[in-house]
């Protein structure tokens, strides 16, 4: 069985945050702490290796850990961060979570590790209704396929899943894990609920 210590986890903070008015979501405060700090607090007891993918405000993010940017400069969305994470992480298995989901399960890493089989390439969280493609675990052997995928301009993650041995991890008992805060209104509402 894959152990959590054999994985690295990347917090994806490289997006443009257009729905948040262009403000860097990971650095926006929720209850007096940046969103990324909430994610780190949930993730750090689960894994010794946390990295941050950010394409701006890198000095601010360095306060929280090792930071790297996308290698594809045309912002191919989370796929650019996943690609860069596979390049920079030192482990064969690399997990990914978004910077704007402050309620990540405290057993998220363990669930992913328990679901790995010998031939698994990609694991994706599933909430019972939908796949959650930014809550995912990749084996580094996917990197050549992902590089080719991005170089030809593909952006639909489902196409990559079809090229790889992809399985899903059941989180239907934990829908709050996937609450992400995309707008100032969602942030304000969540802050009131969580205060």
Curated annotation (Swiss-Prot):
This protein's record includes keyword Cell membrane: no
A biological-process GO annotation: bis(molybdopterin guanine dinucleotide)molybdenum biosynthetic process
Keywords of the record: Cytoplasm, GTP-binding, Magnesium, Metal-binding, Molybdenum cofactor biosynthesis, Nucleotide-binding, Transferase
Residues the entry annotates as binding GTP: 12-14, 25, 53, 70, 100
Binding-site list for Mg(2+): 100
Gene Ontology MF term list: GTP binding; metal ion binding; molybdenum cofactor guanylyltransferase activity
EC number annotated for this UniProt entry: 2.7.7.77
Domain of life from the UniProt record: Bacteria
Cofactor(s), by name: Mg(2+)
Family to which the UniProt record says this protein belongs: Belongs to the MobA family.
Role description: Transfers a GMP moiety from GTP to Mo-molybdopterin (Mo-MPT) cofactor (Moco or molybdenum cofactor) to form Mo-molybdopterin guanine dinucleotide (Mo-MGD) cofactor.
HAMAP family: MobA
Protein name from the UniProt record: Molybdenum cofactor guanylyltransferase
Organism: Vibrio campbellii (strain ATCC BAA-1116)
Gene designation per UniProt: mobA
